[in-house]
Amino acid sequence: EPTVLPARIPQLLLNGSAGIAVGMATNIPPHNLNELIAGLLALIENPEITDQELIQLIPGPDFPTGGQILGREGIRETYLSGRGSVTMRGVAGIETIEAPGRPDRDAVIITELPYQTNKAGLIERIADLVNDKKLEGISDIRDESDRDGMRIVVELRRDAYPQVVLNNLFKLTPLQ
């Protein structure tokens, strides 16, 4: 039984791949189908297309979990040389949570994770950092994800500075 079916599109770029062979590791991220097809059509029409023109058609990877790519230089370097790194960051914002019977509190709301980041592992890592007193200002962590989308609520203490806590989350956890 075949494990890979042939296709007229580059499945390796479409689905991405990760592996190690003969001491070399590779990690190819998934890409957007429409962008890949546009790049292929341009390459078929003009086999002498420049790297810059191709990069404009296929601007970067398309990660299924969302997240933000920080900077375009890492993508460009990877596409041109075959080596490079792409820094990913989850999407998080600061909101004020109103609860009846208690004062309003700020919270960090995480709505998207970087590619291949485990949600349960992230929550566990945040809890460990809070318990070890390496991450200050957090009073509660809740996973409010449902079928409408992912939502992790990191409730802050009243004396905490929300932007400082958010920066520490990026620095100390797999959120970046």
Which residues are covered by each model-predicted region?
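Intrinsically disordered, low-complexity regulatory segments
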Residues: E1-N15, I20-Q176
